[in-house]
Amino acid sequence: MGSLNVSIVTPDGPVYEGVAQMVIARTKAGELGILPGHVPLVAPLKIDIVRLKVESGEEWVAVGGGFMEVNGEEVNILADTAEREQDIDIDRAEKAKQRAEAELSRAKEQKVDEVMAQLALQKAINRIHAKEHS
C-alpha cells in the first residue's frame, strides 16, 4: 500500500507534517476515508477528529473546522484550530468546556449569540475526546 504526505496547518503555523497510509476526516457531507490514489477534492471540515493511520498505529488531531484538499498523494488540511492529542492539556480543555456551557446557558437566557457559544462547546468537547484517545 502507498502512502500520503499529510500536512495540517492553522493560522498559527503547522501542527502536523508526516506520512500516513490513510486519513479519515468528517466533512460537512459526512466522513471521508482518504487512501493513496484518491480523486482530487476540496471539502469543508466539521469540528471533529482527523484520524491518521500511520505505521505505528493511529494519531488523532482535534480540528476546529477548516478545509481539506486532496491532490495526488498529498493531503493538506487548513484548519481554523488544530491540536494533536498529545499536545492537549486536559485541564484546560475541561475548563474551556465549562466556560462554554456557562456561556451557552447565559446565551439562551439573554438571547445573545448562542451559535458562538455552541461552537466553543463543540471545540472543547472535541479536544477532550481527542485527549481521551491517548
Swiss-Prot record:
F-type ATPases have 2 components, CF(1) - the catalytic core - and CF(0) - the membrane proton channel. CF(1) has five subunits: alpha(3), beta(3), gamma(1), delta(1), epsilon(1). CF(0) has three main subunits: a, b and c. Produces ATP from ADP in the presence of a proton gradient across the membrane. Its main location: membrane. Keywords: ATP synthesis, Cell membrane, CF(1), Hydrogen ion transport, Ion transport, Membrane, Transport. This is ATP synthase epsilon chain. It is found in: Cell membrane. The keyword Transport applies. It comes from Listeria welshimeri serovar 6b (strain ATCC 35897 / DSM 20650 / CCUG 15529 / CIP 8149 / NCTC 11857 / SLCC 5334 / V8).
